[in-house]
A protein has these predicted regions:
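Bacterial N-terminal signal peptides
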Residues: 7-15
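Sec-dependent signal peptide cleavage junction
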Residues: 17-24
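Compositionally biased, intrinsically disordered or flexible polar/acidic segments
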Residues: 24-220
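Serine-esterase "nucleophile elbow" of acetyl-processing enzymes
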Residues: 32, 195-249, 264-277
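Alpha-helical cap/lid subdomain in secreted, periplasmic
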Residues: 265-421, 425, 429, 433-438
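N-terminal propeptides
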Residues: 380, 461-678
């Protein structure tokens, strides 16, 4: 499919991009042997027998502090040359710092193929480039939760030869070598840096907008439902015939560790000239581990250094276009009604730093931080709290890093940092609005981005009426107490199993009819038309709902889905597949199954005999739980089943959403609009 012509402003912006990746045009080759080698720069020891220290005028030499953040001490005084290589041996290590050596090479921003020949293999030595975490780069990995985005630029080791493609943003590159064992000499024989030019986009291919950020931007899977990131739903606002969007975000990431693990590097090597890179970090940068080698946290000076001296120069050197997004304010999970929301960045003022850098460097800044606080105060505490990760028992079979959500949030709090899809769509809308705001002010990059938005999205931004973009947002679930199950209603309306009335409402407090409930359940689980037909229509009661859920479950599932088994009371720990140190909370896994045994419920005798066995089955399967005494933000179960109580449309939506997630592939992205229909 041909895409529409770009506007003149976008073409002019492309014409101003740098002509190639780096001012360094020819390969740099360094020889650490005492004998000269053709075409290589000999690294000679000083007259006093010491190793040559870095000299910017000369363009190379050893350093005592690496360019990592924080800088890592290494050694120069103990380096020696044995005629074949430069060697280092360490009598002791300091935690994860194995010291070793760092050879600095003057190299302009741009991409390089780096080759390092060592005296020892990877069992004895580790090579790293400019503070990157080689242990992460040696493993086959993907950058996203669904496993759709593989790392295409790993560190490769072939015997004693190490190879890595690296995009540099600083005026030099550090080649680091650390011994893996004390008392074991390791060394470097040769280093080669070969410039890699920025690549043009193939003719006829679409431009790409990359999003890079933390858990608030990430694309989530069904096993993490209902959590969502704005980068996951952002593509919905764009014209797919004009642009593609790729989300490199993941939880636990900051400017520091997204760089160190190679995420940022791989994005830059995947991109082409003229592609746009939207970057949002700040929440994990608040972590108070700024002195840890592989930490997430940053002081304000480090945060500014990473943006100014690492990220922006590297993006530009690849001919790509940077856009900064200020991190949204965290929501206070205990916010009291009537008290205005305030910006959560009160200790480390990262959004202010990002705004200043944007102004100084001519980089557009989309101020999601400011817009988020405005949105919270317009919307009000009940609806905002409902849209963040406020989870009660029976709301979702998904999990967090601490275990199952099925009995409520395992952290026993309302998590105001993370949020449901109902909120991620609002953040995406606010980001799009910021694009149009900057475009109206004459920013050429914002105009380029704005031209890629859907025409109706641009109209919605101008009018303030988003009902055509998000028709699933019913008129009566947007604020107040009726917004409590807003996320569930939005998804069920999207899926076509709950209908809005002529006034655009879903009437959450009205009674649910049995026929509507069974029809919705059949469609969500892909059951045949005749399934659940034995239930007569009328106002749905909890005991009837329990029996229906049990019948639907057994009609759909031959074996228990992974939500009930793999994620039941388990926490991923080091050594297990999928373990990510950036997401390790140290907590024990929470259970999926009800915390209160069936025998401990106080009113089971009131269940009609015709329903009793199926209701018990549904309860023990975790498909229906007590609604009495449960609280969002706490892992708690009640002791009353209330079998004769009528089911509101809101409570029915809660149960239907739970069953929909239960029927989805755990590792599929959870914004997918799919039922289990076969």
């Amino acid at each position: 499919m041909k895409h529409a012509a770009w506007p003149l402003a976008a073409l002019l912006a492309l014409s101003l991009l740098p002509p190639h990746a780096s001012a360094q045009d020819t390969p740099l080759r360094f020889n650490f042997a005492s004998q000269d080698k053709p075409g290589m720069q000999a690294v000679r020891w000083r007259a006093d027998g010491g190793a040559p220290l870095y000299d910017a005028a000369r363009g190379y030499g050893f350093v005592e502090l690496t360019n990592a953040q924080p800088a890592r001490p290494v050694h120069t005084a103990t380096l020696r040359q044995d005629g074949k290589a430069v060697l280092v041996s360490e009598p002791a290590f300091d935690g994860d710092n194995h010291y070793g050596l760092a050879f600095r090479i003057k190299a302009a921003p741009g991409a390089y193929a780096i080759g390092v020949r060592t005296t020892a293999g990877s069992e004895d030595a580790t090579v790293s480039i400019s503070g990157m975490q080689t242990s992460r780069l040696l493993k086959a990995s993907t950058w996203d939760a669904a496993g759709l985005l593989p790392n295409r630029t790993p560190m490769r080791v072939d015997g004693h030869q190490w190879s890595f493609r690296y995009v540099n943003g600083q005026p030099f590159i550090d080649v680091e070598l650390e011994p893996n064992r004390t008392g074991t000499p390791v060394g470097i024989e040769e280093i080669t840096l070969t410039p890699l030019p920025a690549e043009d986009r193939p003719a006829g291919s679409l431009p790409t907008v990359f999003t890079l950020g933390d858990s608030t931007v990430k694309s989530y899977t069904f096993d993490e439902a209902p959590m969502s990131g704005w980068g996951q739903v952002f593509p919905r606002l764009f014209d797919a015939a004009r642009v593609k969007l790729v989300n490199y975000s993941n939880g636990g990431r900051s400017f520091r560790n997204a760089y160190a693990e190679g995420r940022f590097n791989d994005l830059l090597l995947a991109g082409r000239r003229g592609d746009i890179v939207m970057i949002q970090f700040g929440h994990n940068d608040e972590s108070e581990d700024e002195n840890a080698r592989w930490g997430r946290g940053a002081l304000e000076t480090t945060y500014e250094h990473m943006i100014r001296n690492v990220y922006l120069p590297a993006v530009r050197a690849r001919g790509m276009v940077p856009v900064l997004v200020t991190p949204m304010s965290r929501v206070n999970g205990t916010q009291k009604a009537g008290v205005p929301y305030e910006n959560s960045f009160r200790k480390r003022h990262f959004p202010d730093i990002m705004r200043r850098i944007g102004q100084d460097s001519g980089v557009p800044v989309l101020d999601l931080n400011a817009r988020s606080v405005e949105y919270y105060n317009r919307t009000g505490v009940p609806a905002v709290t409902a849209m963040v990760m406020s989870i009660e028992a029976g709301e979702t079979p998904g999990k967090t890093n601490d275990g199952s959500y099925a009995n409520g949030h395992p952290a026993n709090k309302i998590d105001g940092t993370h949020f449901k899809e109902a909120m991620s769509k609002q953040y995406a809308r606010l980001v799009a609005g910021e694009i149009e705001r900057l475009a109206a002010g004459g920013d050429t990059t914002a105009r380029q981005l704005g031209a890629m938005l859907r025409t109706d999205v641009r109209a919605a931004i101008q009018s303030g009426d988003w009902s055509g973009i998000y028709p699933e947002i019913a008129a009566d679930i947007q604020d107040g107490d009726k917004a409590y199950y807003r996320n569930q209603f939005e998804k069920l309306v999207q899926l076509g199993v709950i209908q809005k009335d002529a006034q655009g409402k879903v009437d959450p407090q009205a009674s649910m009819r049995t026929a509507e409930f069974t029809a919705a359940l059949r469609r969500l689980l892909g059951l045949p038309a005749g399934a659940l037909a034995s239930y007569a229509d009328g106002e749905l009661t909890r005991e009837a709902m329990g029996a229906i859920l049990a019948d639907a479950y057994h009609a759909r599932f031959g074996t228990r889905p992974k939500y009930m088994t793999d994620y039941n009371g388990k926490t991923v720990v080091p050594g297990m597949p999928g373990y990510d140190p950036n997401l390790d909370s140290g907590a024990k896994g929470a259970m999926y199954y009800p915390l209160v045994d069936w025998s401990k419920l106080e009113d089971t005798a009131a269940v009609a005999p015709a329903y009793a066995a199926r209701v018990r089955d549904a309860y023990q399967l975790g498909l229906i739980r007590s609604e009495n005494g449960i609280v969002r933000g706490r892992m708690v179960n009640g002791t009353l089943l209330e079998p004769k109580t009528g089911v509101t449309r809101a409570k029915a939506a809660k149960a239907l959403y739970f069953m929909w997630v239960l029927g989805q592939p755990p590792q599929a992205e959870n914004h997918t609009l799919t039922t289990a229909a076969k």
